[in-house]
A protein has these predicted regions:
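Acidic, polar ligand-binding/catalytic clefts
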Residues: 79, 91-154, 220
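Extended ligand-binding regions for polar small-molecule ligands
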Residues: 29-35, 76, 80-84, 166, ...
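Periplasmic-binding protein-like
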Residues: 56, 135-143, 206, 210-252, ...
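Short loop->beta-strand "edge-of-pocket" segments that line small-molecule binding or catalytic clefts
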Residues: 49-54, 71, 152-166
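Sec-dependent signal peptide cleavage junction
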Residues: 18-36
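Short helix-initiation/N-cap motifs at beta->coil->alpha
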Residues: 92-104, 147, 182-192, 196, ...
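Extracytoplasmic small-molecule ligand-binding "clamshell" domains
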Residues: 31-115
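A ligand-binding cleft/hinge motif common to bilobed small-molecule-binding domains
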Residues: 101, 118-126, 171-174, 188, ...
Length: 329
C-alpha cells in the first residue's frame, strides 16, 4: 500500500497532520456519522483554508506519490479552487477519504468539499449538493490476461471485486444480484486482492482501471464501458448554497482557458499516453457533450425497438397457434 503522509491513531480516534509545501494533509478518523453545520464561504475565507476531501490511493485521480505528496486530477483542480477562492494553491487542507465515507465527511463537516471522483447519482443527490460536472465516466472491468473477462456473462460463478460505496457496487447489486461481490473499503485493498487472486476481476470507473492496467502488464480491461455514461462532480454539504454557487462559477470560468484539458495533460496523459482521447473524459464549463446524451438516447431507443420487435414476434406466434387450433377443431 502506498506510503501515508501521516499516522492515524485509530485507538484514540485522533488524526495527525503534517505541513507539505504549505498545504495541510489530514487523515481523519470516522466518527460514526455525526452531523454538523458546514462552514459558509465567508467562514472559509476568514479561516484562510478550504478543506477538501480526496482519495489517497486512486491513481491518477487522487494518490500519494513516492515522495509522499498528494497528486492527481482531482488534486490539481483542488489547488486551483483554493487559489481562486483564497489567493494561493497552498490555502487548501486535503483530507483523505474512502469511497464509502464521502457523504459522511460532508454531513459531519469534516471537509468543505469532496473532490474524490464522486459520481453523481440520484441517491447521493438526496444527501449532498453536487456542483457542475468536470469529468465523465462509465464502469470498466479489469482482469488477468490469462483469464480475461470480456462480457458480464463471464462473471457467472466468479468473484468480482468492488469497493464499498461505489457505483460499481450499486450497479452489480441491482442488475446482477447473482454475481458474487468481494467488497473492500479502499482501492488499494481491492487491487491487492486482484493481484493475489482473491477475486477474478475488479470493477470501478473505466478511467481508473484503464490507467491501472497500463501499469500492470499482465492485466487488461476486457470490458471498457458498462452501464450509463455518468458524470463526476464536486459535492458540498446539503444546503451550503454560497459555496456551491462559488464552485459552479469557478467551473464555468475555467472553461475559457480549457483548464480541465490542461489538468488532463498534466496528470492523466503521462499515465494514459495516447490510449484515451481527452474528449471522452473531460468536461469543460460543466457542460456534458451532447453526443453522449444522444448516444444514450440511441441506446435506449434500440432497446425499446428490440423489445417491441420481440413483442411483435410473440404476438404473431400466439396468433398463429390460435389459428392452427381453430383449424384443427
Amino acid at each position: 500500500m502506498k506510503k501515508k503522509l501521516l499516522a492515524v491513531l485509530l485507538a484514540t480516534g485522533l488524526a495527525a497532520t503534517t505541513l507539505l509545501g504549505g498545504s495541510i494533509l489530514v487523515s481523519a478518523a470516522d466518527d460514526g456519522g455525526n452531523t454538523a453545520q458546514a462552514r459558509t464561504l465567508d467562514e472559509i475565507k476568514k479561516d484562510g483554508k478550504i478543506k477538501i476531501g480526496v482519495f489517497s490511493d486512486k491513481n491518477p485521480f487522487g494518490y500519494v506519490d513516492e515522495n509522499g505528496e498528494v497528486q492527481g486530477y482531482d488534486v490539481y483542480f483542488g489547488k486551483r479552487l483554493a487559489k481562486d477562492l483564497l489567493g494561493s494553491e497552498d490555502d487548501v487542507e486535503f483530507t483523505y477519504v474512502e469511497a464509502a465515507s464521502r457523504v459522511e465527511y460532508l454531513q459531519s463537516a469534516k471537509v468543505d468539499v469532496i473532490l474524490a471522483n464522486f459520481t453523481v447519482t440520484d441517491e447521493r443527490a438526496e444527501k449532498v449538493d453536487f456542483a457542475l460536472p468536470y469529468m465523465k465516466v462509465a464502469l470498466g472491468v479489469v482482469s488477468p490476461d490469462d483469464a480475461l473477462i470480456t462480457d458480464v456473462k463471464d462473471l457467472e460463478g466468479k468473484k468480482l471485486i468492488v469497493v464499498k460505496g461505489t457505483t460499481a457496487e450499486t450497479y452489480f447489486t441491482e442488475n446482477y444480484p447473482d454475481i458474487e461481490l468481494v467488497k473492500f473499503d479502499e482501492y488499494q485493498e481491492a487491487y491487492d486482492a486482484l493481484l493475489d487472486g482473491r477475486g477474478d476481476a475488479f470493477s470501478t470507473d473505466n478511467t481508473e482501471v484503464l490507467a491501472w492496467a497500463q501499469q500492470n502488464k499482465s492485466f487488461s480491461v476486457g470490458i471498457e464501458s458498462l452501464g450509463d455514461i455518468d458524470t463526476i462532480a464536486p459535492a458540498v454539504q446539503k444546503g451550503n448554497t454560497d459555496l456551491l454557487n462559488a464552485i459552479n462559477d469557478e467551473i464555468k470560468s475555467l472553461a475559457d482557458e480549457q483548464f480541465f484539458h490542461k489538468d488532463f495533460e498534466e496528470t492523466l496523459k503521462p499515465v494514459y499516453g495516447d490510449n484515451i482521447n481527452p474528449e471522452d473524459l473531460v468536461v469543460e464549463g460543466g457542460v456534458v457533450d451532447s453526443e453522449d446524451s444522444a448516444a444514450e438516447d440511441a441506446e435506449e431507443a434500440d432497446t425499446t425497438d428490440a423489445d417491441a420487435a420481440s413483442d411483435d414476434t410473440e404476438n404473431a406466434e400466439v396468433t398463429e397457434a390460435l389459428e392452427e387450433t381453430a383449424a384443427a377443431e
